[in-house]
């Protein structure tokens, strides 16, 4: 299992270093029984571009995920670090907790879940090792 982390210039805004970030994601992937994912850490401007280009939605979002039908790559997650920082304040959640909840959401989509009770349960289980469920 592996995490391909891109967009390292944005990680300084998050409350963990690159190695901690990758270790957390690898633990989540292990639970989700996924092999390899790409994670792009981006700005609001960049995620707005991807949101328009791939989802045909105008504006900023916090996370996008793209499952792939590839034995070497389960999927990609695009995470707006700007949105994580802003929304964690807005929702009064610690930035670490909020970031991990968005990552669990993206991983759930890559694992094949759609919004609903089963996905919520899956995300809660992904977060249990971090005591965030």
Curated annotation (Swiss-Prot):
Cofactor entry: Zn(2+)
Binding site for Zn(2+): 105, 109, 115
Any GO BP annotation: rRNA processing
Protein name in the entry: Endoribonuclease YbeY
GO molecular function: metalloendopeptidase activity; RNA endonuclease activity; zinc ion binding
SUPFAM superfamilies: Metalloproteases ('zincins'), catalytic domain (SSF55486)
Lineage start: Bacteria, Pseudomonadati, Thermodesulfobacteriota, Desulfovibrionia, Desulfovibrionales
EC top class, as a word: hydrolase
Compartments, as annotated in UniProt: Cytoplasm
A family per Pfam: YbeY
Function: Single strand-specific metallo-endoribonuclease involved in late-stage 70S ribosome quality control and in maturation of the 3' terminus of the 16S rRNA.
Keywords: Cytoplasm, Endonuclease, Hydrolase, Metal-binding, Nuclease, Ribosome biogenesis, rRNA processing, Zinc
GO cellular component labels: cytoplasm
Documented EC number(s): 3.1.-.-
Record note on cofactor: Binds 1 zinc ion.
Source organism superkingdom: Bacteria
Similarity field: Belongs to the endoribonuclease YbeY family.
InterPro entries referenced in this protein's UniProt entry, alphabetically: MetalPrtase_cat_dom_sf_prd, YbeY
């Amino acid at each position: 299992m592996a995490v391909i982390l891109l967009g390292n210039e944005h990680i300084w805004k998050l409350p963990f270093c690159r190695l901690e970030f990758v270790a957390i994601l690898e633990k989540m992937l292990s639970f989700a029984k996924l092999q390899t994912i790409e994670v792009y850490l981006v700005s609001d401007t960049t995620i707005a571009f991807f949101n328009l280009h791939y989802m045909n939605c105008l504006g900023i979002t916090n996370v996008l995920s793209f499952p792939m039908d590839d034995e070497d790559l389960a999927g990609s997650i695009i995470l707006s670090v700007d949105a994580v920082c802003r929304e964690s304040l807005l929702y009064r959640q610690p930035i670490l907790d909020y970031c991990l909840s968005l990552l669990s959401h993206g991983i759930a989509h890559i694992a094949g879940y759609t919004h609903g009770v089963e996905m919520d349960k899956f995300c809660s289980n992904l977060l249990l090792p971090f005591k965030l469920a």
